[in-house]
Amino acid sequence: MCGIVGYIGDSEKKSVLLEGLKELEYRGYDSAGLAVLSNDRLEVFKTQGKLENLKLELKNKEFLDFGVSIAHTRWATHGKPSSANAHPHFTENLALVHNGIIENYASLKKELENKGHAFLSQTDTEVIAHLLEETLKSESDLLKAFEKSISLLKGSYAILMLHKRAKESLFYAKSSSPLVVGKGKEGVFFASSLSVLAPKVDQFVILEENSVGRISLENFKDLNNIENMKDYAFEDKDYSKGNFRNYLEKEIYEQHSSLLECLEGRLEALSVYCEIDPEFLKNVSEITLCSCGSSYHASLASVYLFERLAKIRARAILASEYRYAHFKSNPNELFIAISQSGETADTLEALKLAKAQGLKTISLCNAPFSMMSRISDHTLLIRAGVERSVASTKAFSSQVMLLWLLSVYLGKQLGTISKEEERIQAKNMLNSVNAMKVEPKLHEKIKRLSKRYLHGHGFFYIGRDVFYPLALEGALKLKEISYLHAEGYASAEMKHGPIALVDSNLFTIALLSKHLLFDKTKSNIEELSARDSTICVLSSEILEIADDFIQLEESESYMEEFFRMNLAVQLLALEIAMRLNHDVDHPRNLAKSVTVE
């Protein structure tokens, strides 16, 4: 969601902070700002919109002397996007940035207003600044006052604060929101993500949950759990768009490579392997998959695979619902939490609840140092690489692939899948990887037909069995980047209400599998065609009633079909959004990493 950067040192602070914010830009934001304390002078700069606006504001500024500094990209939760609501928030003597949500800010704000504090913004974060100023009236020690103020907050937060009385230090607080600190030759650096620090630091610390402290160049060495950056491999990847029009297009094209990376060391000689000790999976009789957004659609798809291949009961639950639904747990239940970032707030809290209930836990994520990977029993990395675009493509595909592999591996350990079936599934996985190569003819056809789908009152994406979750994902992709209304449905559900919306101005994207329920799905498509919906069919089998037909190559299995259709719906969403002139990498109102509830 939001991004935090902090720096203590004598390098030029504007460039350090802006470079860090640029690395966090893909997470999504609507405003940005920074504060620098140097030579006894506190300066704050804030702008609405893109980082370019902040750069223009700072065009003639340089901060060359030693000092402390903080910066932030904001995604609005309390208060509209504006310069006033942007971070840092400040008083005469301090400035701070904050990721998270302060749940009791309204009552704290009322108390502070009664004591004479005047607020300039609509945010929950500004309350923290005034709360600290108020606390300092009775507690002169800065760290103690900071700790006392933090203890009054309810909610989630990662906070960095600088104060005129502490010219060589930054104060931090962390609870349910990521924050990392590291030290290198040029000083001490803070960030929301370790990847931002990797090129700059030799040592780093993932700050502990519910920790509060003060850090300077001198006392960094006193932190607990210091790790050496050289012990970890951070690939120096080319993050430029290259010849692609945007990062989303690039990442769609990268999926063949990212899926190969996902399977590296996990599929050899048509046998599947996994980093999880078979003993850990012994006696597992039920699986709960917990996630949000695209990860939830990957979870739904895997339910069919776990039940069909491993012969084990599985269910997919939205993380935001799991936390409050009081589900009865099973002692032999395996809880799988799925999140690209490994920091998704609802999924993280659901994982903590599962741990508290004594369940066996596995995290699937794309970040080796994420909070989810640190608290679960085991972590399986999807190895999708960095996704700059907010809309998930590589991560979704890799999640489905890894869950598919896990279903076969689990069946192998439980004795519910034969060696021959394992070989068949392994071959199908390799075929599915190859299916994710973008054929120029396919892309050109989708680009041409996309112009038909720019107007109307909405889209139905329909599919059955494992293609139902893919219909949900296809509809989500279109919604995210085109801002057109789209809904995914199980095909047979049309007659139970949604068909009332069908007319000549409604588009249907039909996922017609040759291998699963072909005749049933065809019948559902005919029902929609009879009511004048414009039908676009994705299939290897020609359907005469289709108004548009995206013919896919023949597939040997339904999962190979799944990945071929996945690629096609991603390209269709991309091309429709491009025709509508939208910023597909940074859709409005969306954040890449949702670290608040």
UniProtKB/Swiss-Prot annotation:
Recorded GO MF terms: carbohydrate derivative binding; glutamine-fructose-6-phosphate transaminase (isomerizing) activity
CDD domains, per database record: GFAT (cd00714), SIS_GlmS_GlmD_1 (cd05008), SIS_GlmS_GlmD_2 (cd05009)
Pfam families: GATase_6, SIS
SUPFAM superfamilies to which the protein is assigned, alphabetical: N-terminal nucleophile aminohydrolases (Ntn hydrolases), SIS domain
Coiled coil start-end: none
GO CC field: cytosol
Domain Glutamine amidotransferase type-2: 2-218
Compartment list: Cytoplasm
Residues the record marks as active site: 2 (nucleophile), 592 (for fru-6p isomerization activity)
Reaction catalysis annotation: D-fructose 6-phosphate + L-glutamine = D-glucosamine 6-phosphate + L-glutamate
Gene Ontology BP term (one): UDP-N-acetylglucosamine metabolic process
Broad class of enzyme this protein falls into: transferase
Enzyme Commission identifier(s): 2.6.1.16
Subunit and partners: Homodimer.
Function: Catalyzes the first step in hexosamine metabolism, converting fructose-6P into glucosamine-6P using glutamine as a nitrogen source.
Classification via HAMAP family: GlmS (MF_00164)
Identification of the protein by name: Glutamine--fructose-6-phosphate aminotransferase [isomerizing]
Organism, scientific name: Helicobacter pylori (strain ATCC 700392 / 26695) (Campylobacter pylori)
